[in-house]
Regions:
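Charged interaction scaffolds used for protein-protein
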Residues: 1-9, 17-34, 51-97
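Short, hydrophobic/amphipathic alpha-helical patches that form generic packing surfaces
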Residues: 39-49
Length: 97
């Protein structure tokens, strides 16, 4: 999917492990989704991993931007949730086979 931040369109791709790996480098722990902070850092990690040459915002700048853009925050949070639900369902399906 695409996300527009400060008038620039960026890819927001959760179809690889790159966002998760980037999250783990930033946070020093696996993603749990248990806190708003976890989710916001995953959003940042996804944008950074999806746009390695274009993304220039710091995490602090991004969280300030998020505060003023709740609709975009919700869209990205839903995409993250949907992807982790999809992964969990695939894992359960594999266990049943």
């Amino acid at each position: 999917m695409k996300v527009t931040v400060n008038g620039v369109e960026y890819s927001f791709a959760l179809n690889s492990f790159a966002p998760t790996y980037t999250y783990e480098v930033i946070m020093g722990e696996p993603f749990s989704g248990a806190t708003t902070r976890n989710i916001h850092v995953m959003m940042f990690a996804t944008l950074l991993a999806s746009n390695p040459d274009e993304w220039k915002m710091t995490l602090a700048q991004f969280t300030e931007w998020l505060y003023d853009h709740p609709a975009e925050e919700q869209t990205m949070a839903s995409a993250i949730s949907d992807e982790f639900i999809r992964r969990a369902e695939l894992s359960l399906k594999k266990k049943k086979e």
